[in-house]
């Protein structure tokens, strides 16, 4: 027996020695020979998929079968979140902004992120993508409606004043909600932490990585990470589905007002289907093609409309309103940021917006980390925390400032359209006062759609990145999430605006866990930035 084993061993060794040299199969070749199953490509074995997908499915099911119960639960959760976490969110956003500025203006400002010597996307394209993605549909309808809302009902910090002063106060409060603090939480400190841990340390480009400085490997491989990813996906899906649904409702209303199209479920669904097709195709083509292209054309159309309104609109008031509004916001920056007296007003304005932006935070940080390689900390923070907010404020002055000027000249013209919080009616009332109102109104509707498309494609792409852990997720999962968000929006609007409104409020509830995902970035970003500065020989 022993001789047989020895002979067998000798034969095996001889065969191994004489065999042709082994050529390892490359990963791409292996994938071509053994393509992953649909189960794998959709990440159906991923617990994050089941956590996020099941929750969204349950939400839609409740919306369709028991709207009253869902609304009651969401309202209760909304009230709890704004009451007990509102002050925490206000401090969180303020600290995030101030620490970011300190890093930008210190030696750490020269730190180059992402392991590249220069940016891989040129500045105009990069800023276009950032602006269009973060503004979403709010960049048009809220720009028109929020200033008149604060004009009609004065913010409690300012109180009642003369009409002209009230108009500037209204712009100032709008600038606060869409300004420095809001933009900073969407991708400054959190993006710095993600870019270091992903590009320098090899950790996944996922929300769970933001918890790594606190929990270590447990955040990457344990249930904590799965929960962080799922909460972030639910929050951003809710924040994207809501605007998609409102796009259908608002464009349908506008088409009825302008052209007499029936304002019904069919028209609303057709608008959403068109948006689904556009943002899904854009997401499939990737960051370097579709997402850049849509963002670039979006910015070009915005600039053309800005030029038109500046030339034919209330130019003097727009410029004065912008300068005085920004000045008043800066002058009252800390009182506005930390205002806590009228909690009822806060819950529907400042704290609502802070919860909304926090809900987007981790996923936007991932998207910004993906497109910002090669930029310095100073470029990143000053572009997102300062330049982008000032551009946004100017856009609000163009659209909302025009509305205020028309209201001052003809009281009731814009405020009557706003009754019932009718956002598209305000926009149409403003464009109706400009030369060639029909053409300008249509262009604004196109702009609104492309704003939503840029958010839809970016978030479809980012959710797919989180699901797969790949910077270039497969087409199947991109298509799935793009279609899923649109289908959910259609399902919710089938029961009227109640389902979409509940979903919009729900994102504020999701901001409770998401705000704790963002907290480690505020605590750890300075140390990480200093370490990168040392590694790059800057200190």
Swiss-Prot record:
Transmembrane segments: 44-64, 85-105, 129-149, 175-195, 231-251, 265-285, 299-319, 348-368, 380-400, 426-446, 480-500, 503-523
Keywords: Amino-acid transport, Cell inner membrane, Cell membrane, Membrane, Stress response, Transmembrane, Transmembrane helix, Transport
GO biological process, one term: amino acid transport
Main location: membrane
GO molecular function: transmembrane transporter activity
Induction behaviour: Induced by NaCl upshock.
Pfam families: BCCT
Subcellular location: Cell inner membrane
Membrane-related topology note: Multi-pass membrane protein
Disulphide bridges: none
GO cellular component, one term: plasma membrane
Family: Belongs to the BCCT transporter (TC 2.A.15) family.
Function per UniProt: Involved in the uptake of the osmoprotectant glycine betaine.
Name recorded for this polypeptide: Glycine betaine transporter 2
Organism: Vibrio parahaemolyticus serotype O3:K6 (strain RIMD 2210633)
Lineage, opening ranks: Bacteria, Pseudomonadati, Pseudomonadota, Gammaproteobacteria, Vibrionales
